[in-house]
Amino acid sequence: MAAIYGGVEGGGTRSEVLLVSEDGKILAEADGLSTNHWLIGTDKCVERINEMVNRAKRKAGVDPLVPLRSLGLSLSGGDQEDAGRILIEELRDRFPYLSESYLITTDAAGSIATATPDGGVVLISGTGSNCRLINPDGSESGCGGWGHMMGDEGSAYWIAHQAVKIVFDSIDNLEAAPHDIGYVKQAMFHYFQVPDRLGILTHLYRDFDKCRFAGFCRKIAEGAQQGDPLSRYIFRKAGEMLGRHIVAVLPEIDPVLFQGKIGLPILCVGSVWKSWELLKEGFLLALTQGREIQAQNFFSSFTLMKLRHSSALGGASLGARHIGHLLPMDYSANAIAFYSYTFS
């Protein structure tokens, strides 16, 4: 039977599996819930991966008892070697027919491998946030990715938290809100289905669910699109924080990445980028200021890109490469540019 390669995109909110033939054709897809082992634990993580892969195998007409040739896992929280090793051991021990070979990479590495063979910057803003630079020689550098207790700036969680905190601080008279809190306060009570601030505490502590809390970001986006000044302010600040992540990795970027016809390629991953127009002003401000402070004359332009396919495709490619097989990839079909900018 012809070899089949698998890839997993594992996010903090949802996950996806792709099965790919040895000539690069996508055979089947399956999706599921979060596979971030830091959030849900190793046991639940491997069970969800196994269930999704087997569902994809059945869709592709493949016997679930026939192992994949390789499975490349592009996981949120996939950059800790010891945790990755434990995850692979669990997959091998509990599900021996899942795959012959495994490779665990970060969600950023899977994303960039989907979009380009040459490297670039991946800027993730979904439930959480992260920025990873992959240079042409494969070396990596990064900023962020430390989770909601230490960062996640510019993410859906961060936007939701900023909104809630501004309301709390304003009512407490601790800090004046930059704009009227009326819309955000009512949206907060409605989203969490509570009558007052005390009701919010249950969602912050006893019943805290990062994905659920981050979902409040959608209400802030709706407010911003309707013209609410505070919602627009929060998104502008989120754009600024995301831009500062790019500024942080500028000194580590191989100059070759600045020299292509599209400038520095920045791959934007995560649902917050759907609100690019709300992020744009703060993002450009942070990049312009950071470029000037660092005197980064090489950095003259950039292009923002988004994936047309799941980063599971890049995961499959990296997993295949790990065992010596190069999957054919049509990079022009895998990613599309949505914004370009040249500094004056």
From Swiss-Prot:
GO terms for cellular component: cytosol; extracellular exosome. InterPro entries: ATPase_BadF (IPR002731), ATPase_NBD (IPR043129), NAGK-like (IPR039758). Pfam families: BcrAD_BadFG. GO terms for molecular function: ATP binding; muramyl dipeptide kinase activity; N-acetylglucosamine kinase activity; N-acylmannosamine kinase activity. Keywords: Acetylation, ATP-binding, Immunity, Innate immunity, Kinase, Nucleotide-binding, Phosphoprotein, Transferase. GO terms for biological process: defense response to bacterium; innate immune response; N-acetylglucosamine catabolic process; N-acetylglucosamine metabolic process; N-acetylmannosamine metabolic process; N-acetylneuraminate catabolic process; positive regulation of nucleotide-binding oligomerization domain containing 2 signaling pathway; response to muramyl dipeptide. The modification N-acetylalanine is found at A2. It catalyses: N-acetyl-D-glucosamine + ATP = N-acetyl-D-glucosamine 6-phosphate + ADP + H(+); aldehydo-N-acetyl-D-mannosamine + ATP = aldehydo-N-acetyl-D-mannosamine 6-phosphate + ADP + H(+); N-acetyl-D-muramoyl-L-alanyl-D-isoglutamine + ATP = 6-O-phospho-N-acetyl-D-muramoyl-L-alanyl-D-isoglutamine + ADP + H(+). The keyword Acetylation applies. The keyword Cell membrane does not apply. Belongs to the eukaryotic-type N-acetylglucosamine kinase family. Homodimer. This is N-acetyl-D-glucosamine kinase. The gene is NAGK.
